Amino acid sequence: MKKITTVLALFVVALFTSCNNQQTLQEYLVASQEKNGFITVDIPINFIKPKSLDVSDDVKETIKSIRKVNLVALPYQGNEEAYETEKETLNTILKTNDKYKSLMRMNTQGIKMNIYFTGSADAIDEVIAFGYAKDKGVGVARILGEDMDPSKIIDMMNNITVDGDGLNLKKFNLAF
């Protein structure tokens, strides 16, 4: 009887310590679709096209490895109070979850940008770009794929265009 009680107690402890109440990026993206002031777009993969017909096979292969692209932004103007809250929420999600590894940070034209990834360094499954600027707003872009090569992703980004007809991507000019 003592063994059963010990095993049951260990199970209960394991159950409670394994529960994680941290919000995930996926939960944040879904919740943002319902929040006032947010701009959200899910870009269908068939909208991502090579800039020209003579792009490398690596670019074509990288495009094929992408499954989903999500964009979420909150323009600063008119959302001053929510800006700080949302910036801190995203910072917390990305910095406290061991799943997200920092790839690089940059500061360009007053926009602070952090790039994160999941997977291994040579086979990335997810790329997250998180940026913010006090006069622009806060936003996050997520590319989901399968075994993406970081150097090929950069090459691809320089060689693609997004067919924005029907997506109304101009609304992102408000934020960035």
Task: Show where each model-derived region lies.
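Sec-dependent signal peptide recognition
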Residues: 2-9
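C-terminal partner/receptor-binding element of secreted or periplasmic proteins
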Residues: 146-176
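Bacterial signal peptide processing site
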Residues: 20-23
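Early exported N-terminus immediately downstream of N-terminal targeting peptides
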Residues: 26-90
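A short, solvent-exposed beta-edge/loop patch
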Residues: 120-149
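Generic detector of solvent-exposed, compositionally biased contiguous segments
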Residues: 34-60, 99-116, 166, 173
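Mid-length scaffold segments of soluble, non-membrane domains
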Residues: 74-115, 119-122
